[in-house]
């Protein structure tokens, strides 16, 4: 087993989700990559590529470590909705998602030594209630959308917009724990309910 685990993400949500299964990375190191979707790239292709590139970017600088990376994207049909850049874009996202079903895809990647990067993808279906102009304006003003794929955060106020969810709540938050646990165990990391309990109540 490698000497340490690095989380290739700046997301505090992913760090908190790892703690739920008793995992505490030795280092948190966000990858510095271009996250612009390629022309014609489908949401599934994009999210797999992003998670892979994040893991490989960090691995190229810490080849002796295990690298865990993840990427989340909201997709309305074939359209990729990355993080909103400003209030105008966040508003347009919410108008698009209002009253309709969309997908939330999270890819998680594990890179160790010189082995090929292993990637697993969790696909989830989310349906929003119909949002009034006032609700959209109020949510955008809250700032909760900042740094969130699709312009909303399921772990915050926006959860009250969700009429239906099929899939993994942790995946929509940014890290599917089922797939992550599988990757970590295959990489040789000891995971147990007791270690998770100790981490939570330490």
From Swiss-Prot:
InterPro entries: ITPase-like_fam, Maf-like. It holds the Pfam family Maf. SUPFAM superfamilies: ITPase-like (SSF52972). GO terms for molecular function: dTTP diphosphatase activity; UTP diphosphatase activity. This is dTTP/UTP pyrophosphatase. HAMAP family: Maf (MF_00528). Its cofactor is a divalent metal cation. Keywords: Cytoplasm, Hydrolase, Nucleotide metabolism. GO terms for biological process: nucleotide metabolic process. It is found in: Cytoplasm. Nucleoside triphosphate pyrophosphatase that hydrolyzes dTTP and UTP. May have a dual role in cell division arrest and in preventing the incorporation of modified nucleotides into cellular nucleic acids.
């Amino acid at each position: 087993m490698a000497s340490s685990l690095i989380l290739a993400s700046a997301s505090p949500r992913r760090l908190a989700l790892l703690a739920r299964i008793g995992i505490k990375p030795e280092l948190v190191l966000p990858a510095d990559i271009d996250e612009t979707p390629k022309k014609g790239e489908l949401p599934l292709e994009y999210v797999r590529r992003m998670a892979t590139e994040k893991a490989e970017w960090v691995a190229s600088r810490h080849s002796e470590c295990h690298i865990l990376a993840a990427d989340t994207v909201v997709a309305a049909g074939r359209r990729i909705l990355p993080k909103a850049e400003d209030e105008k874009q966040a508003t347009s996202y919410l108008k698009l998602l209002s009253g309709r079903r969309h997908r939330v895809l999270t890819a998680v990647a594990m890179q160790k030594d010189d082995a090929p990067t292993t990637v697993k993808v969790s696909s989830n279906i989310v349906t929003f209630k119909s949002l009034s102009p006032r609700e959209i304006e109020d949510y955008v003003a809250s700032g909760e959308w900042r740094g969130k794929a699709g312009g909303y955060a399921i772990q915050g106020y926006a959860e009250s917009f969700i009429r239906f969810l099929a899939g993994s709540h942790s995946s929509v938050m940014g890290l599917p724990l089922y797939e992550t646990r599988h990757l970590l165990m295959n990489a040789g990391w000891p995971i147990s309910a007791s270690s998770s309990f100790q981490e939570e109540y330490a």
